Amino acid sequence: MRNGLYSIHIQMGDGVKGRASGVLMLRDGKFLGGDPYFWSKGTYTFREGSWKGEVVTNQHTPYHDPTARPVFAGREVTTGFSGTYQNDRSEVFGTSLVGSRSVSFQATLRRLADI
C-alpha cells in the first residue's frame, strides 16, 4: 500500500443494512480518517499485494435523524481487516465487534493523492 489519501466505501454484511463513505490517510503503517459521523485510527502491515490491520472507530457527531439506527451506536468499536491491493485500489474484508455482536463488512479503497 502506498502512502496517500484514499477514499473508502463500506458495505455491511451479515444482513445488516448499512454503508458508509469517507477518507483515510495511510502513512508508514498507520492510518487516520473518518466521515461526517465517525473517525478511525489504526495500524496495518502489507506485503506483495496483501495487507491486514486493526482499526478503532469512535462516533464524533450524533445523527440528527431520530429514526437512524447507527450500527456502532456511539460505541468505540475495534475492527480487524485483511485484503488485497494493486496500483491505486484495494478491496478489504473485515469484522467489527459491536458489543457482543460481530458484524462483517467489505470495503473498496481508491488512492486520491500523495501525502
Task: Label every PLM stretch briefly.
Residues 1-16, 92:
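Tryptophan-anchored aromatic micro-motifs
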Residues 8, 31-34, 51-55, 90-95:
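Short hydrophobic/aromatic-rich beta-strand segments that constitute the beta-sheet cores
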Residues 36-87:
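Contiguous, well-ordered beta-strand patches that form the walls/edges
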Residues 12, 34-39, 56-60, 96-102:
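Short, solvent-exposed aromatic-acidic interface loops
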Residues 21, 45-48, 91-115:
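Edge beta-strand at a domain terminus
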Residues 14-16, 52, 61-63, 102, ...:
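Residue-level signal for secondary-structure boundary sites
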Residues 24-26, 42, 83, 109:
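Broad, structure-driven detector of short, well-ordered beta-strand segments within folded domains
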Residues 21-32:
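Short, flexible N-terminal segments of the mature chain
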